[in-house]
Amino acid sequence: MAYIQLQFHSDALMMQVTVNVILPERATTMIGMEANGTDTFKTLYLLHGLSDDHSIWMRRTSIERYASEYNIAVVMPSVGRSWYTDTVRGEKYLTFVSEELPGKCRGFFKGMSEKPEDNIVAGLSMGGYGALKVALTHPDRFGMCASLSGALDIAQIKDPGLLPEWRCIFDMNLQSADELAGTEHDLMFLASQLHEKGIAFPKTFIWCGEDDFLLQHNHNFAAHLTSLGVDFKYEISEGNHGWIWWDMHIQNALKYLIG
């Protein structure tokens, strides 16, 4: 696999950005890992959590090895603490991840398919929320999505310490998280919108650990999808909000989605 640290100017964010990219590679003398790259390939957009950045998946997991197994590209952006949202301050993080970033990458690197069935978005914690937000907002661009320990019921986040920064992201007048219910920031609302419009749901994998503080969020969202008749994969198993589990279950996500 080729590993590239990419820097370019984002019009959506109005600033320079850094993105880590892994690309399939052809090689005949590589030891310990397959290098059977093809001319076209699927792309995984892999999203970080609240405290992290574009580097974290490379530093904490073996994502390069997993990507090699499935012959996929992996694109890892950095979005700060934006909740993958077009903020009220003007930074368009949802637009960046769902529109601008794929377009830029396809321009820079040949072989990345534009077909929805060849584009996956996945993430952990805040990134799990972001992955489903991207996929449910743009199912015409992302045919598969995965959340690990995702904050999937944002209206139920009861941390008052987040409100000051959330007012700069979601709504300047926000008084509590439950005001986000029924808006474009609510994953259940987005799922219901797809159902009402008869739009095909992205192939979806959700995992959360039994000891994760976001477990009830995942139960709530899974129950909502079930009520809509959505066919999806929901796994609950041993684990908490930590990398030993995310490294394990990103493999399960890839196996379910494209294996």
What are these regions (language model features)?
Residues 1-259:
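Non-catalytic cap/lid and distal C-terminal segments of serine-dependent acyl enzymes
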